[in-house]
Amino acid sequence: MFEYRETLGINFDPSHLIWQGMDPVAALRELKGAVYHFHAKDTKVDPYNKAKNGVLDTGSYGDLLDRSWVFRTVGYGSDTALWKDMMSTLRMIGYEGSVSIEHEDGLMSVKQGLEKAIRFLQDVMITEQPAQMWWA
């Protein structure tokens, strides 16, 4: 997709792709070898407000009821299947770096958002190396 050096890589934040209607899994596949950091942050898109305002909503981030989309704690915007697909794809593209929780959820305290994000990610992250494929 583009030329890059070993010292230059992507800080992948799926939340921005989600509000734009893009597929973060497809983006991860395209960026194989260029992802150097991963942010665990989610977005909830409100279909009614999106139909009215579009995705380039310039309203206040504090206007949670009327915005087309809002940042959410992981698991409160997108379903578990998307997060499992992202974690699996990170493994397939060879990413072995950190998963950094970024809390920008206007509905939860930082403490509660962090606690919920940790619990959610514990279920979807792949932390052990796979066994040899004896069936292949």
Predicted regions and their residues:
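A general structural detector for well-ordered alpha-helical segments in enzyme core domains, enriched
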Residues: 1, 27, 82-89, 116-121
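Acidic/histidine-rich catalytic cores of soluble enzymes
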Residues: 1-74, 131-135
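A structural motif corresponding to the C-terminal end of an alpha-helix
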Residues: 4-5, 85-96, 128
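Conserved, mostly hydrophobic/aromatic
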Residues: 13, 38, 90, 99, ...
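Soluble or luminal CAZymes and related metallo-dependent hydrolases
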Residues: 20, 78-82, 113
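Residue-level marker of alpha-helix boundaries and capping positions
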Residues: 76-77, 108
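A short, acidic, flexible beta-alpha connecting loop/helix-capping segment that sits on the rim
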Residues: 100-109
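C-terminal helical cap(s) of enzyme catalytic domains, especially alpha/beta-barrels
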Residues: 110-130
